[in-house]
Amino acid sequence: MTKLDSPQFEPFELTAADYAFPMFYAGCTLSFRLKSPEMGIPVLQTAVERITAHLPFLTGIVIPSAVKDGVMEVHPAACGQSGLEDPQCRVRRLPHLCLPPKTASASANKKHGSGMTYDRNECLIVAPLEAATAAQQHPVIRFQINVLADGIIFTLFANHMVIDGTGLGIITEMLASCCQTADNTGSVPELAGAIDREARTRAMLGTIGRREREKVQFEPVAAESAAPDGHQEVHDASLVDCNFRLSADKIRRIRERAQELGIASASEDDIVTAVLWLCMSEFRSHSGAGKEISACTLLRMVNVRRRFHPAVPDNYLGNCYIMIEETLPTTDLSGGAAQASTEEDFLRLIGVVASVLRSRLNRVDDQYVRDHLAQFTHAGDWAHTTIHEPDVAVTSLRGMSVYSLDFGSVLSGIVDFETLPYMNPDGVCTIKPRRVIDPSWEVAVTLSREDMDRLRKNELFRWLVVGESYLHIFQSAQQVTTFA
């Protein structure tokens, strides 16, 4: 689909929930292993066309308002604004590449291969990076079909000021439904009423912070001069990205033992987050102003769709996350772990930290969310907070059902899901979607090379890890991947 036939829609302003994030792009890849990769191209292209026909704002661009300073809007992309060479869904043929062997992600052993070189920019060839480098008009989302020797890597690359991680998951579910419908012509329930649902939800979220916005008087400004003034994210090519598999049995055991000890109830997601916070606090911490005791700050991304009253629809595509900060002295975190001499000590410590996280989450209700988001009334507000400077940041996609989706007779199911490291800063951890067969907790971690080595040597972390590897989306068609 080109800009000439892009669906039209009524422009709309972004909400306070959207301004809680800076202008950056987040991407994920869906890998399909195919005997005839070319056959998958029209299936995915038609699916994208059907989705954008039902949700035309996905073809739009994010630009500053022409009349309201600090306000960003989504508009239809007029011909020439981004150029005809910038299609909604691009096809790129990479016959010299192939998917990693099936055993690479499922059974990587505990040896990391630290002598191996890693280039985090290498995988970015599968992403339409042009969307992120536009000077003024920032596309809402772009797709790229990468055709390899033995399959397809389908990339979704979205503007995080419009679509969050859950939104990408919903779009993936819509894609699957469109692909499995015979000849891509049958009805798709997921698309029915989607545009009305988006409009109603945005109207509700648009009321948050309205009073604060009305208190400030702005002079009308030209759209081209109203560039967003949020924090500028920088892609750091020197960082490394690793995938770790944590034992599902041990995570379950920690939770059960915590309950036996009378520690406040915590979910397994809380347990994994606590583990990452504990282990990384050993080398990622800070000293508060005028304080001798160092502390470690955790930033946890929380999906608040169901914490609103009434709840926001689960399948709303726009931003509906908040960032919750929690800070503890390192003496309570890594210090406590250093003093733990037995497995029982480990279980108790993790349970205690996880209960702190659960207790904080239990306080997040409708009023809490509205008060939190009310501070983000304009695009530049994010830059004036400190929430983007944590020691450790954790977001969870564990509940995303990508591995159970059926993409039809041509594509079948996804063999691998990855988050692209583009713009991922130091200290970010992503709990990845659960696989259908393997219950292990897969976690993607971004750190400096030195800190990654420190994490791998952490005693508690080594006790939990059952497999690890560098981020590995594809390989040379001539290469045989081993984890040694």
Curated annotation (Swiss-Prot):
Gene3D superfamilies xref list: Chloramphenicol acetyltransferase-like domain
Disulphide bond pairs: none
Class of the enzyme per the UniProt entry, highest EC level: transferase
Acyltransferase as UniProt keyword: yes
Listed pathway(s): Secondary metabolite biosynthesis
Coiled-coil annotated residue ranges, if any: none
E.C. designation(s): 2.3.1.-
Catalytic activity as recorded in UniProt: hancockiamide A + acetyl-CoA = hancockiamide B + CoA + H(+); hancockiamide G + acetyl-CoA = hancockiamide C + CoA + H(+)
Record-linked InterPro entries: CAT-like_dom_sf, Sec_Metabolite_Acyltrans
Key words, A-Z: Acyltransferase, Transferase
Short name of one Pfam family: Transferase
Membrane spanning stretches: none
Molecular-function annotations in GO: acyltransferase activity
Family of this protein: Belongs to the fumigaclavine B O-acetyltransferase family.
Function: O-acetyltransferase; part of the gene cluster that mediates the biosynthesis of hancockiamides, an unusual new family of N-cinnamoylated piperazines. The NRPS hkm10 and the NmrA-like reductase hkm9 are proposed to convert two molecules of L-Phe to the intermediary piperazine called xenocockiamide A. Xenocockiamide A is then converted to hancockiamide D via a series of hydroxylations and O-methylations.
Database matches in PANTHER family: FAMILY REGULATORY PROTEIN, PUTATIVE (AFU_ORTHOLOGUE AFUA_3G14730)-RELATED (PTHR31896), TRICHOTHECENE 3-O-ACETYLTRANSFERASE (PTHR31896:SF64)
Protein name: O-acetyltransferase hkm3
